[in-house]
Amino acid sequence: MNPKALCSFLLATFLLLTVTIMPSVHANAEANADAIIGPCPKKPIGIVC
């Protein structure tokens, strides 16, 4: 593998991981905030706050 291809591969992998991991991290942070502060009132019905 030449360095340019390797760099592209690593960048693509990083972006994929970011897109995959960030929403779950965000959901966990929101759940933790709800546990500390209390449920947020402005969520649509059907979404567990």
UniProtKB/Swiss-Prot annotation:
Compartments, record wording: Secreted
Signal sequence residues: 1-27
Alphabetical keyword list: Disulfide bond, Secreted, Signal
Top-level taxon in the UniProt lineage: Eukaryota
Tissue distribution: Expressed by the venom gland.
Propeptide: 28-35
Record carries keyword Endoplasmic reticulum: no
The record's account of how the chain is modified after translation: Contains 1 disulfide bond.
GO CC annotations, alphabetized: extracellular region
Coarse class of the protein's main subcellular location: secreted
Acetylation found in the keyword field: no
Family named by the database record: Belongs to the formicidae venom precursor-01 superfamily.
Protein name as catalogued: U6-myrmicitoxin-Mri1a
Organism: Manica rubida
